[in-house]
């Protein structure tokens, strides 16, 4: 998935990549800050600040538009279908060369003033289903959005969001993630060594916690081994299969 904030100017500043299903917004960026529990970046030419925090099967964004105008959000699935909802978007994306679908449910704190399907560099306001959905927010300069993902269904993605994130406060979600990581990495305290050596050690320790991944969703899980949904029997199902989370385009 691609989540792309844009200031509407000429055709939403969207350039086609030669494929209708792959629209992009051209960004340059600076002041990037990455931690295990947060991400922020300034899209300098667009004058847009993006803040992000992940949860288990959900994530949250705060987008600040620095320029007055008709601000918009484009959600794109490279290989799937999206539907414009009252406050956002739902749908699925197929992982390349597999039968596996990643489902998405995304909602914003503000109701979009209008919405439509982006295709051929233009937005069809009459259509509400397609590979790329454009949501318009007018002169609103601050946009909050949150999403859930699932390997089971868009409805389950919504449940995952409602379970993991109940706020539109990015800092609150990031702070919760920071506490979890501090508790986890703080189980081992090292003495001596240089700061560089400590960074290497804790970076390596952090990476050991990136795998395995719990794919259970309210007692069920999708297995890519047979393409079926199973009951987990009360035992979380772990695998090295990655979730693919929507993120700002670079």
Across the structure, where does each feature detected by a protein language model lie?
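Single conserved hydrophobic/aromatic residue that forms the stacking wall/gate
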Residues: 1-9, 14, 243-250
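Beta-sandwich/jelly-roll carbohydrate-recognition scaffolds of carbohydrate-active enzymes
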Residues: 6, 10-239
